[in-house]
């Protein structure tokens, strides 16, 4: 087989839990995606390659894993928001028939309702639940605080022993005070608030763990199979090479499923103790209490612009809580360049479980705060809020998106004076914008293999959250080799495949797709090199298309794909790909327009339509991009009108830790959503899972303001808040 030119590149790998930089050899190939107009698969609306498996029930999720002799685990959780454990007696649980393992050393001082205290593995879920009731725990309740407003008080109970309030260091540029004192500016001041929200993944967190000697196999619902592997290895004190993690399919993560977490380590420990495989799946209450949430934020804002609408100054003081963790910060001011800025943000510790990333962490909160302030200031200036944005937004992609979205929503129909719509049920229009990174990075190392029988597979240890990774991986290889997408088998979700990073931050596509493209190009080059020798033609004259191999200028000389692959001999072709920065882009832009109806007698808000215009660079699968936009908008509608975690300050308990009182939109709440994919001619791929959720709530809030002429300063926008704003309650 002809020798291929190679080059050495640096990449990051993880071995036994340790991350380090190494040099590897990869094919030396010029990289470009090519002209989208000439592509058969990429950029088109491609049905999911695993779609039939999912709709017929053949797709295997974590809860579908069934192993011989498998046990079922349950976790005993603290009923107190803060307590000291004086004693634990698990003897009655251990004697219960069917119980195989019990753990009681998980914590001595739980700091939130729902923290893990003990766990059992038994022959059935019912036996495991009964065993939990037989574990007797003596608690000493301790002082606690569950709301950031109370936790800020000097007399509030200390969550970690020290101060509850951290941060607050000013971030400043320009001369803020002088800018606000200028005679030619209009100043707006207000306070805006966004509550914490649960992830509410369709599939709950869970694992199945099975030991084979000193090797562990874990089936996990996770956004990062290698993250789970490394975390389990570290916690169990074994080499990472002894841990295999599998995630064939999963039902969403939204930022909450990056590691093994407590339940993963508990599951593995119980399986080791019991000498049998163990399944541990969390229920909906546990999902709310112990798997994280997106933190809320409250911001006191001061914003100024000249009378002709040029932004001049921004000042904000904000606070939020990540529970017993941190990370409630938001990127303020958001999107629009402001020359004079001063911000302070405070993290407030509370006796609530630790927050985690939630789709576009911090950005939906920042968007609601910034875009509400922008509309309010535009109202004071007497300017069209869209004109005000376009005057202050230098991004050329968003400028084009504004024009496109305004046309599609019929922006000319908006109330020129907010609240002046006739009738009891008033209509209004609003707009808001988004920005996201969407770039990727090195680390993914896929393998493409072509066998002599014509079968083609691509293997990579990434995972598909439901976003369509498996489909575009197959499409990239099919495009490069001139095959039908059904001729390419995409194998992902297993740490036995090549390394790939966690799926989050909209980085997966921009990290995985370039590496798969490089592997597919290398496979094509190797194949063409062999065929050119066998067919005695110039490699440049060989054409791979429509599942055939032809020679340019000689139509009678053609081979079927199987005939061509048979010429490879017994070895076949197996090549690896490495990330190429020339194939990925970053900095995706988007905007959304909302139309709402507000019943001024009941206070009910109905979202009539959302027009969402989103950029993502080179589109790999248009159908998947449209689906991501629609899904993001629905989460944004939910954030705007429904979601809020409610706590009882007297008991520290979450009052709506279920899917009955924790409100989510139903089918009747879904508006008409027009998803517009803005084709940005960069020729490079970017991620876009996050940005569609960012501006929705802000656009809806601004539409409500346009309808009734009153600002709802906090989410969710409930009927009670609307009626209060109208002075009717």
Regions found by a protein language model. Give the residues of each.
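Short acidic, glycine/serine/threonine-rich loops at helix termini
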Residues: 131-134, 220, 229-231, 254-260, ...
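Active-site-adjacent "gating/activation" loops or surface patches in catalytic cores
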Residues: 223, 438-457
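Thiamine diphosphate
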Residues: 249, 253-275, 279-282, 470-476
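Short, aliphatic-rich beta-strand segments
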Residues: 73, 216-220, 455-460, 607-609
């Amino acid at each position: 087989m002809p020798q291929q030119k190679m080059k050495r590149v640096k990449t990051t790998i993880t071995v036994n839990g340790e991350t380090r930089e190494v040099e590897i050899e990869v094919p030396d190939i010029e990289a470009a995606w090519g002209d989208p107009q000439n592509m058969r698969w990429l950029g088109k609306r491609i049905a999911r390659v695993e779609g039939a498996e999912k709709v017929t029930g053949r797709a295997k999720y974590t809860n579908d894993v069934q192993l011989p002799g498998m046990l079922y685990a349950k976790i005993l959780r603290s009923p107190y928001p803060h307590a000291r454990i004086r004693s634990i007696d698990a003897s009655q649980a251990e004697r219960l028939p069917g119980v195989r393992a019990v753990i009681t050393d998980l914590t001595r001082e739980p700091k939130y309702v729902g923290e893990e205290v003990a766990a059992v593995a038994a022959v059935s879920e019912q036996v495991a639940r009964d065993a939990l009731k037989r574990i007797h725990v003596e608690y000493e309740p301790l002082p606690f605080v569950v709301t950031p407003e109370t936790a800020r008080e000097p007399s509030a109970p200390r969550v970690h022993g020290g101060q509850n309030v951290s941060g607050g260091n000013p971030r400043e540029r320009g001369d803020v005070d002088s800018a606000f004192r200028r005679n030619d500016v209009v100043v707006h001041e207000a306070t805006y608030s966004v509550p914490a929200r649960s992830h509410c993944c369709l599939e709950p967190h869970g694992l199945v763990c099975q030991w084979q000697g000193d090797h562990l196999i874990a089936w996990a619902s996770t956004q990062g199979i290698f993250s789970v592997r490394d975390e389990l290895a570290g916690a169990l004190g074994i080499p990472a090479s002894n841990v295999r993690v599998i995630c064939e399919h999963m039902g969403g993560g939204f930022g909450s499923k990056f590691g093994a977490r407590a339940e993963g380590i508990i599951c593995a420990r119980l399986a080791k103790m019991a000498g049998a495989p163990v399944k541990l799946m969390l229920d909906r209450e546990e999902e709310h209490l112990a798997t994280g949430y997106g933190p809320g934020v409250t911001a006191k804002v001061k914003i100024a612009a000249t009378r002709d609408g040029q932004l001049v100054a921004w000042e904000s003081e904000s606070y939020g809580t990540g529970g017993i963790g941190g990370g409630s910060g938001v990127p303020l001011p958001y999107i629009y360049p402001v020359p004079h800025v001063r911000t302070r943000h405070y993290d407030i510790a509370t006796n609530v479980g630790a927050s985690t990333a939630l789709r576009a962490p911090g950005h939906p909160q920042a968007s609601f705060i910034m875009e509400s302030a922008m509309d309010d200031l535009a109202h004071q200036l007497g300017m069209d809020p869209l004109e005000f944005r376009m005057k202050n937004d230098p991004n050329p992609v968003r400028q084009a998106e504004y024009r496109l979205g305004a046309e599609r929503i019929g922006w000319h129909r908006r109330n020129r004076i907010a609240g002046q719509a006739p009738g009891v049920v008033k209509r209004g229009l609003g707009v808001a914008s988004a920005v996201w990174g969407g770039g990727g990075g090195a680390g993914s190392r896929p393998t493409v293999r072509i066998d002599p029988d014509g079968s083609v597979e691509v293997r990579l240890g990434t995972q598909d959250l439901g976003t369509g990774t498996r489909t575009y991986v197959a499409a990239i290889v099919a495009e490069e080799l001139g095959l039908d997408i059904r001729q390419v088998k995409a194998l992902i979700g297993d740490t036995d495949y090549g390394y790939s990073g966690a799926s989050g931050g909209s980085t997966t596509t921009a990290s995985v797709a370039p590496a798969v493209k490089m592997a597919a190009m290398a496979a094509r080059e190797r194949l063409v090199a062999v065929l050119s020798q066998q067919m005695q033609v110039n490699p440049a004259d060989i054409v791979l298309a429509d599942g055939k191999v032809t020679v340019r200028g000689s139509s009678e000389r053609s081979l079927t794909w199987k005939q061509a692959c048979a010429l490879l001999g017994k070895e076949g072709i197996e090549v690896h790909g490495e990330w190429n920065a020339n194939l990925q882009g970053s900095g995706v832009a988007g905007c959304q327009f909302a139309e709402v109806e507000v019943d001024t007698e009941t206070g009910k808000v109905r979202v009539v339509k959302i027009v969402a215009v989103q950029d993502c660079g080179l589109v790999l699968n248009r159908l998947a991009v449209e689906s991501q936009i629609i899904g993001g908008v629905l989460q944004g509608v939910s954030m705007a009108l429904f979601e809020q975690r409610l706590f009882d300050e007297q008991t520290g308990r979450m009052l709506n830790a279920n899917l009955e009182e924790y409100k989510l939109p139903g089918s009747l709440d879904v508006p008409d959503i027009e998803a517009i994919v803005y084709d940005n001619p960069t020729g490079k791929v970017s991620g876009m899972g996050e940005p569609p959720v960012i501006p929705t709530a802000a656009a809806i809030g601004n539409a409500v303001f346009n309808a009734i002429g009153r600002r709802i300063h906090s989410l969710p926008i409930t009927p009670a808040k609307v009626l209060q704003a109208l002075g009717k309650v």
